[in-house]
């Protein structure tokens, strides 16, 4: 069997239609993401010392999580620590 025959038989199924539309702008994607999380999450903005921000980033990277997840973890850890005092 030649290669052209193999190519025809291996791709004999129907191909799906081209579905890619216009890309969604980043601002709109972010708005949709925030809307999905609005019931369980609240926005948080803080200005902290650069060295502490760098350490937060390092801690999050070591754990393989986002900085937001690292902040949640640190807060939960502190709440548990205070409950045992």
Swiss-Prot record:
UniProt entry tagged with the keyword Repressor: yes
InterPro entries per UniProt: RepA2 (IPR019661)
Segments for region (Disordered): 1-41
An example Gene Ontology biological process: plasmid maintenance
Source domain of life: Bacteria
Record's compositionally biased regions (Polar residues): 1-14
Pfam families on file: RepB-RCR_reg
Keyword terms: DNA-binding, Plasmid, Plasmid copy control, Repressor, Transcription, Transcription regulation
GO molecular function: DNA binding
Keyword Zinc: no
Function statement: This protein is involved in the determination of copy number in gene replication. It binds to the repA promoter thus inhibiting the synthesis of the mRNA for the initiator protein RepA.
The protein's name in its UniProt record: Replication regulatory protein RepA2
């Amino acid at each position: 069997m030649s290669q052209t025959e193999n190519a025809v038989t291996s791709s004999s199924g129907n191909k799906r239609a081209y579905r890619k539309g216009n890309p969604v702008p980043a601002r709109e994607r972010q708005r949709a993401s925030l809307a999905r999380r609005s019931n369980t999450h609240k926005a948080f903005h803080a200005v902290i010392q650069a060295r502490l921000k760098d350490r937060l980033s390092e801690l999050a990277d070591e754990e393989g999580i986002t900085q937001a997840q690292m902040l949640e973890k640190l807060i939960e850890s502190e709440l548990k620590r205070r409950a045992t005092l």
